[in-house]
Amino acid sequence: MTILFLTMVISYFGCMKAAPMKEANVRGQGSLAYPGVRTHGTLESVNGPKAGSRGLTSSSSSSLADTFEHVIEELLDEDQKVRPNEENNKDADMYTSRVMLSSQVPLEPPLLFLLEEYKNYLDAANMSMRVRRHSDPARRGELSVCDSISEWVTAADKKTAVDMSGGTVTVLEKVPVSKGQLKQYFYETKCNPMGYTKEGCRGIDKRHWNSQCRTTQSYVRALTMDSKKRIGWRFIRIDTSCVCTLTIKRGR
């Protein structure tokens, strides 16, 4: 599982170029790093300049695994520091990592999504086999109340969005960096129009409740242009989840 996760992380970074949003200067190879997430060395800096041509031996693979696990721990710690206390801040969803600047379509979900899954895997590894079987949703026959789909979309798909002041802004498709331009990608989650819950939420007693699966939105930071042609980074709303809404049926 560790090697599989490392392969996913390597492929994730391989399709992405980084560049800091906090500074005007672009460092390194023009990659975009988000606040709270540190940039780390390449595989060459971990295993030496010729590691890629030699291939990974068992010792280098173990060293690489240890290095990535250390990076994962740092990223999770930083995410907890950047993410505000959700109980005291209603705008906590603004800090989700659903935006990426890349030269091509990302091959994986956002990195922090993968980190959370890997963290859950590590937690599950400490359970007994019997507890793991009992906690596995698939073994318990669990189903989602609403069917949803998640995918990367570009500014060409979105075109416009609503910012925090309620105004409509134009989402810029490309972001200039020192060595060219990168596209903005947004990881959106919405209700599946082709799913089995388009007529109502799953598992709801239709005799007493009216139910509907609805797409909800959260704020993410993106490069936009307002009606006065002013370009800047603003928080905009994108689709981030599919939830079930209920209304009680009135007696006839």
Swiss-Prot record:
Mature BDNF is produced by proteolytic removal of the propeptide, catalyzed by a FURIN family member. In addition, the precursor form is proteolytically cleaved within the propeptide, but this is not an obligatory intermediate for the production of mature BDNF. Can be converted into mature BDNF by plasmin (PLG). Keywords: Cleavage on pair of basic residues, Disulfide bond, Glycoprotein, Growth factor, Secreted, Signal. GO terms for biological process: cell surface receptor protein tyrosine kinase signaling pathway; modulation of chemical synaptic transmission; negative regulation of neuron apoptotic process; nerve development; nerve growth factor signaling pathway; neuron projection morphogenesis. Its main location: secreted. GO terms for cellular component: axon; cytoplasm; dendrite; extracellular space; perinuclear region of cytoplasm; synaptic vesicle. One of its GO terms (molecular function) is nerve growth factor receptor binding. Residues 43-62 are annotated as: Disordered. Residues 19-133 form a propeptide. Disulfide bonds join C146-C213, C191-C242, C201-C244. The record marks T57, S58 as: Cleavage. Glycans are attached at N126. InterPro entries: Brain-der_neurotrophic_factor, Cystine-knot_cytokine, Nerve_growth_factor-like, Nerve_growth_factor-rel, Nerve_growth_factor_CS. Residues 1-18 form the signal peptide. Brain and central nervous system. It is found in: Secreted. Belongs to the NGF-beta family. Monomers and homodimers. Binds to NTRK2/TRKB. Can form heterodimers with other neurotrophin family members, such as NTF3 and NTF4 (in vitro), but the physiological relevance of this is not clear. BDNF precursor form: interacts with the heterodimer formed by NGFR and SORCS2. Mature BDNF has much lower affinity for the heterodimer formed by NGFR and SORCS2. Important signaling molecule that activates signaling cascades downstream of NTRK2. During development, promotes the survival and differentiation of selected neuronal populations of the peripheral and central nervous systems. Participates in axonal growth, pathfinding and in the modulation of dendritic growth and morphology. Major regulator of synaptic transmission and plasticity at adult synapses in many regions of the CNS. This is Neurotrophic factor BDNF precursor form. It comes from Sus scrofa. The lineage of its organism: Eukaryota, Metazoa, Chordata, Craniata, Vertebrata.
